[in-house]
Amino acid sequence: PVTGEWQTYTFKLSDLAGAGLDVSAIDVLMIFPAWGAGEGAVYRVDNVKIYNPNAAPVASGELNVFTDTVADQWSIWDCCGGSTPTTETDDDQHGAVAQFSIGATPTVMGFLADEGVSFDASALIENGVVQFDLKVITAPSNVDAQWLFKIESIGASSAVELALTQSNEGQTPVTGEWQTYTFPIGQLFDAGLDISAINVLMVFPTWDMGNGALYRIDNVIIANP
């Protein structure tokens, strides 16, 4: 460091892992002079991030939650079932997709933003949509289970839950077939969602009726179509 000048510093996660760091559970980052030799130091730090510099940029005002891979600062998520959703290879059109499997423990699944992270869709209220592709590989064993879409704002301060049949397409999932589902941002806002702080998107069978369900999701966007 040169006193009075900003300098960028970059460390590869692969190098840190090679040095012994568990990169799956990072919870502290520190920058400091040598122990016992820092008296008098005054310094500033900015633009601290853990990210993929090669990730495709997201268009301004829009969010690609999942296409081939999950967005930075988002994850594929199982609320309560204890499973780890995976990324699997599907057909040529879809490529890598998110896969979810529900067992006997009641749960909901989808995509979750990191702590304190959310997406502001306010600029999309007129024409924007939440859209995704769904393919059910194995239907739930309970034939009365209904497929649902749920979206929440940060801190679960507001949420909207709708049947997939309430989408623009109005289609019930057909096992083994991909189907696109579209929900207008304006519709979600009118239903009570705080669209300025979206941080959870979920697709799942009715609570406690999902045992046996195996399904895939791709092309999850919050955007102007």
State the predicted function of each range.
Residues P1-P225:
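Beta-rich carbohydrate-recognition modules and glycan-binding surfaces
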